[in-house]
Amino acid sequence: MESEMSDPQPLQEERYDMSGARLALTLCVTKAREGSEVDMEALERMFRYLKFESTMKRDPTAQQFLEELDEFQQTIDNWEEPVSCAFVVLMAHGEEGLLKGEDEKMVRLEDLFEVLNNKNCKALRGKPKVYIIQACRGEHRDPGEELRGNEELGGDEELGGDEVAVLKNNPQSIPTYTDTLHIYSTVEGYLSYRHDEKGSGFIQTLTDVFIHKKGSILELTEEITRLMANTEVMQEGKPRKVNPEVQSTLRKKLYLQ
């Protein structure tokens, strides 16, 4: 006997309150990174259009990456009015999990992400924190694969494992790492690309979409991924493909406009 099942119910849309201050910090290594100034100009236009209080710092050393994030955290916690959202843009040469400072030394991305989490930044508890990372994450190059006919990429996910968890509703507390969005210029293990005169395709596409399109930020990142997946980068005379990677622990819809 088949059990009766009710019709699926649409999700209730819950949005982050964006009526408070919006703060942004951009840390960019321009040394040996031609085209990065063009990216910074595009980001400044975007933040101005989206009504962010924006701070931009050039050529931080590895240690200064951490120091600037610490100072940004203190600025947020001491802001006179409620803060709704924070953006952090990190642009540098990189490897898997690492960024290279102006002094050629490395800083761990995880150490940078720790600074604004729900434990360390009280003013941003339960508030969206968006990281945009324009950097290589390895040495692999993606030549791309051809789609056949109406073939689309997709797959099924399974939830499994040996752990047993007891769940109970406790809205009075939240995990340390919620309300965070990481937008990487490329997938883990792969190179990121930048044009000497036009800047990076990632930053230029992102700023264009964030200014000219409306939707939740996750919908906007889907559009950025679609646009970048449809373009080709020439490197050493060979066509390459690149697409962003998005990691989200957002609990609500984030709308910038």
Swiss-Prot record:
SMART domains tied to this protein: CASc
Localization in the cell: Cytoplasm; Nucleus
First-tier enzyme category under EC: hydrolase
Propeptide intervals in chain numbering: 156-167
UniProt keyword Oxidoreductase, yes or no: no
Knockout consequences: Mice show a shiny and lichenified skin with an epidermis containing more alveolar keratohyalin F-granules and an altered profilaggrin processing. The skin is highly sensitive to the formation of cyclobutane pyrimidine dimers after UVB irradiation, leading to increased levels of UVB-induced apoptosis. Mice accumulate incomplete filaggrin breakdown products within the epidermal stratum corneum (SC), leading to reduced levels of natural moisturizing factors (NMFs) and lower SC hydration.
EC number: 3.4.22.-
PROSITE patterns referenced in this protein's UniProt entry, alphabetically: CASPASE_CYS (PS01122), CASPASE_P10 (PS50207), CASPASE_P20 (PS50208)
PTM text: Maturation by proteolytic processing appears to be a two-step process. The precursor is processed by KLK7 to yield the p20/p8 intermediate form which acts the precursor to yield the p17/p10 mature form. Initially it was reported that cleavage by granzyme B, caspase-8 and -10 generates the two active subunits, however the physiological relevance has not been established.
Gene3D superfamilies the UniProt entry points to: 3.40.50.1460
Tissues expressed in: Embryo, adult liver and less in adult brain and kidney. Expressed in differentiating keratinocytes of embryonic skin (at protein level). Expressed in keratinocytes of adult skin suprabasal layers (at protein level).
Assembly and oligomerization: Heterodimer of a large and a small subunit, both processed from the precursor; the mature active form is a p17/p10 dimer and the intermediate form a p20/p8 dimer.
Protein name, per record: Caspase-14
Organism, as annotated: Mus musculus
Recorded name of the encoding gene: Casp14
